[in-house]
Amino acid sequence: MADKTDIISSSSDKASPPPPSAFRNYLSSGSKEPVLLLESAGKESCCIFRVPESFVALNPKAYKPKVVSIGPYHYGEKHLQMIQQHKPRLLQLFLDEAKKKDVEENVLVKAVVDLEDKIRKSYSEELKTGHDLMFMMVLDGCFILMVFLIMSGNIELSEDPIFSIPWLLSSIQSDLLLLENQVPFFVLQTLYVGSKIGVSSDLNRIAFHFFKNPIDKEGSYWEKHRNYKAKHLLDLIRETFLPNTSESDKASSPHVQVQLHEGKSGNVPSVDSKAVPLILSAKRLRLQGIKFRLRRSKEDSILNVRLKKNKLQIPQLRFDGFISSFFLNCVAFEQFYTDSSNEITTYIVFMGCLLNNEEDVTFLRNDKLIIENHFGSNNEVSEFFKTISKDVVFEVDTSYLNNVFKGVNEYTKKWYNGLWAGFRHTHFESPWTFLSSCAVLFVILLTMLQSTVAILSYLNDKKGNGNAAPPPLGLP
């Protein structure tokens, strides 16, 4: 585009009428720059996005890989060269396995090159031309597959630094679930099936095996998602977190969008009058009569929140660096991918409401065991959820927690629920307050009894004195 100094001039300058072609020249002056958001970015085929700076500013390290670059967005960055140097070695191991099945290298390369147009449409911005991008897809795709195959036990490789250094493997697990660090899932399928090392239905299984430890779920939890057709690895693992919500659970309210902004008491919605309001914090809900219950199930998604009467049932959240990074990138994916639902975003907003301050985290962590904190201080957990909830947009009428929000608000609106809950909290919260209240009640009853006895005694004395014979004259 035109330079800023070309646009700003003194008010005394007298500009002559521009030639007819000047406006078109101005528009085309920046056409040689790479397109940062393609027109195809709004289509279902586009699923890998560059996270905007407004998101990055809130969590600067959350969207950038620590040890390995996958795909074009972070290729060549200096701090990622350590694993980059190992990729050709793992690629060769993969090609050796394919060769045992009579599949040559050029067959796999050609299969990926034939997908070039589809691959380019999967990214939100314009990528460099030439075959280098396709070669990158082959290298990164084979690296990922080899990591999965080794970790699942399909291929043995002993004393390899990538798999024997715990910190390194943990970092790779996080890096493979970053939105900017993805290759299309169909590239992985093409290489996996084309190599004849495995069948397409096994790809999800070995991917789940790789991520099962940091997510800490049983085998049956993963099995139900074995046939899911993912867009990329982030989408695949995100799918396993989604609750099984029937259409009847979803609200039939008008279509409304909620945007959260920071207020004095936390994040508050900016919506029209038809919108479902958000809920109070955990401690305040407790004072309004809402009871919190831990929902225990290894096969249950942590998003399976339920409200039964005044009991809010929440699965345990094991919150650590891996899950926090995963949440952030899932929210970014749901915000940018046009064909995505909004379950993770809704859950984050829900938890952001509950965890408004450090005391709320302490209550759900220590008293109810709903949060298992491996992330940092209780205040850091609260700040995380409040920060990630800022400026996200989600559709209330398709929110899977819509009925929970409505049910909680309807219960807390009834003044007598809060009055009784407050009385119970004040006098019967713990054995000590209960004993203290009983002691006070005993003293009150004893005092009333003493007063009653004194009054009755006085009345009896007065009655007795009234019926007595008068004393003789002259005697006192």
Swiss-Prot record:
The regions listed as transmembrane in this protein's record are 133-153, 439-459
User: Main localization of the protein?
Assistant: membrane
- Where in the cell is the protein located? Membrane
Q: Name one GO cellular component term.
A: plasma membrane
Which keywords fit this entry according to its UniProt record? Membrane, Transmembrane, Transmembrane helix
Instruction: Identify its membrane topology class.
Output: Multi-pass membrane protein
Q: Where is this region: Disordered?
A: 1-24
Q: Which family does it belong to?
A: Belongs to the UPF0481 family.
Protein's recorded name: UPF0481 protein At3g47200
From the broadest rank down, the organism's phylogenetic lineage runs: Eukaryota, Viridiplantae, Streptophyta, Embryophyta, Tracheophyta
